[in-house]
A protein has these predicted regions:
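Glycine-rich beta-strand-turn "strand-cap" elements at beta-sheet edges
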Residues: 2-10, 21, 54-60, 88-108
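Short, conserved structural micro-motifs that define repeat-unit consensus positions
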Residues: 39, 48-53
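An amphipathic, aromatic/His-enriched active-site/gating alpha helix that lines ligand/cofactor pockets
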Residues: 44-47, 69-102
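Short, well-ordered beta-strand segments in beta-rich or mixed alpha/beta enzyme
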Residues: 15-23, 53-80
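A generic beta-sheet turn/junction motif
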Residues: 36, 47, 58-59
């Protein structure tokens, strides 16, 4: 794995999960936005959540980007079993979007 000398070894071991979400019906953009903001607020309180950011594209209103960093793979798995993820994200967000996950390795 390539990394810079100054990069914290803790960061190398983290789970970085970046997700592109494309809203299928433009009429649902505001709904998806509100649900993602709620998901982010809850996720940031979960054990192991180091970063959970939600971006809304300026060039394509139907596109959102989630940038997540978790201390361990176990923390990410626990997040995916969290009540908010199971009761809000999966049933209310996922049916409204096309989801492209990008588990990532941070280079710098």
């Amino acid at each position: 794995m390539w990394h810079t000398e100054w990069q914290d070894s803790k960061d190398i071991m983290m789970e970085h999960n970046n997700v592109i979400l494309r809203v299928i019906d433009p009429a649902n953009i505001d709904t998806v936005s509100a649900l993602l903001l709620d998901q982010a607020r809850v996720s940031l309180t979960e054990p192991g959540c180091e970063r959970f950011e939600v971006y809304h594209s300026r060039s394509d209103a139907q596109t959102f980007l989630l940038i997540e960093s978790w201390a361990t793979a176990e923390d990410l798995d626990a997040h995916r079993n969290n009540k908010n993820f199971v009761e809000i994200y999966k049933p209310k967000v996922l049916p409204l979007v096309e989801r492209i996950p990008h588990p990532s390795e941070r280079l710098i």
